[in-house]
């Protein structure tokens, strides 16, 4: 399923990037072999951080913190570190969507029937029809059939359940982006309030609350030759 989702992303990219109306406005790019080094190019350039994991179903990472520190605003669920980011920046500076962990648990307990949500969300049938028609697969109507069956059959990550809420949050993003002074203020607040996620704070708190380790002063006593001769090594510390 993961490989099929990647194929789906690239299929969307083929359509969007070939649309002349989108030229200079929007491009879809899949970053293969994503790692920290590549992230160093993405984090400073991002305006919006999409943290779309279903509440309670994903281990917390640090990518959302790095986006926040670089001034990107967050659209996300109450999952992982998103909760702490929202607490730091305030509700008005975070684009929240989706059910809570308790809401997901209740939905699962009641018996989740994703197919019943299709008719209640006007945009959802259109999206599913585009996928089913082969619009993103060069006319191949069967390529993404497993993806459709997964979504409409049992939807283990409750994607359809959070879809309408996500659209509303994206509308709020568009309105904020149109008001550039407001957006810039929100961006600055995200950076200014990211201190909670610094490694200094984390290590200090681990020392105090978990490791219960005391500070131990270290004194380095060695002479350093400020102008060493070529090929000459500095003396090692005792």
What are these regions (language model features)?
Residues 1-40, 45-48, 224-228:
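Catalytic cores of eukaryotic secretory-pathway lumenal/extracellular enzymes that build
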Residues 44-46, 52-187, 191-201, 205-227, ...:
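Catalytic binding pocket for nucleotide-activated donors in carbohydrate/polymer assembly enzymes
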């Amino acid at each position: 399923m993961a490989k099929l989702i990647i194929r789906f992303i690239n299929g969307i990219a083929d359509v969007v990037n070939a649309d002349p109306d989108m030229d200079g406005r929007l491009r879809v790019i899949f970053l293969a072999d994503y790692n920290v080094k590549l992230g160093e190019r993405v984090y400073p350039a991002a305006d919006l951080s999409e943290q779309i994991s279903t509440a309670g179903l994903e281990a917390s990472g640090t990518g959302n913190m790095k986006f926040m520190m670089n001034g990107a605003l967050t659209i996300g669920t109450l999952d992982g570190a998103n909760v702490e980011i929202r607490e730091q920046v305030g509700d008005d500076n975070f684009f929240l969507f989706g059910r809570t962990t308790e809401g997901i648990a209740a939905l699962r307990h009641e018996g989740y029937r994703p197919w019943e949500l299709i008719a209640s969300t006007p945009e959802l049938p259109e999206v599913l029809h585009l996928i089913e028609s082969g619009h993103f697969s060069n006319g191949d109507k069967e390529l993404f059939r497993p993806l459709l069956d997964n979504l409409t059959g049992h939807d283990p990550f409750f994607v359809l359940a959070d879809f309408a809420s996500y659209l509303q949050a994206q509308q709020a993003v568009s309105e904020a982006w149109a008001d550039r002074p407001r957006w810039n203020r929100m961006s600055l607040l995200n950076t200014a309030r990211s201190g909670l996620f610094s490694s200094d704070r984390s290590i200090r708190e681990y020392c105090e609350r978990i490791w219960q380790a005391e500070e131990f002063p270290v004194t380095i006593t060695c002479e350093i030759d400020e102008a060493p001769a070529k090929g000459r090594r500095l003396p090692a510390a005792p």
